């Protein structure tokens, strides 16, 4: 399932995520198999881009790479871009981080 969520593109690796804001802590949750997205919980509220900034900072810490929001800047369903990692690198990191694997 994780291989369907992590995709290669010309610009880098794309990951489909679903964001829950106002969480107790920043964390990667489980895979939402119905939506084919990884659940990300963020403490910040979606006000004036604070949640998007928190998502990028949180994921940058996990992937040790630049993170860009490719689509969904105003939606809970987003696609993030990681320009300088391979799909294999990302899948390995996610398998360690995701709670349902």
Swiss-Prot record:
Family matches, as Gene3D superfamilies: YggU-like
Q: Which domain of life is it from?
A: Archaea
The record's SUPFAM superfamilies line, in alphabetical order, gives:
YggU-like
Q: Which InterPro entries match?
A: DUF167, YggU-like_sf
What the entry lists under Pfam families is as follows: DUF167 (PF02594)
Cellular component, GO annotation: cytoplasm
Concerning its family, UniProt says: Belongs to the UPF0235 family.
- The protein in question is named UPF0235 protein MmarC5_0538
Species this chain originates from? Methanococcus maripaludis (strain C5 / ATCC BAA-1333)
């Amino acid at each position: 399932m994780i291989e369907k969520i992590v995709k290669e593109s010309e610009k880098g690796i794309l990951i489909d995520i679903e964001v829950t804001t106002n969480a107790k802590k920043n964390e990667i949750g489980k895979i939402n198999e119905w939506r084919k997205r990884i659940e990300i919980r963020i403490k910040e509220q979606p006000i004036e881009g604070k949640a998007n900034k928190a998502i990028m900072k949180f994921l940058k810490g996990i992937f040790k790479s630049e993170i860009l929001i490719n689509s969904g800047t105003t939606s809970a369903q987003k696609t993030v871009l990681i320009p300088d990692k391979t799909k294999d690198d990302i899948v390995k990191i996610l398998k360690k981080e995701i709670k349902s694997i």
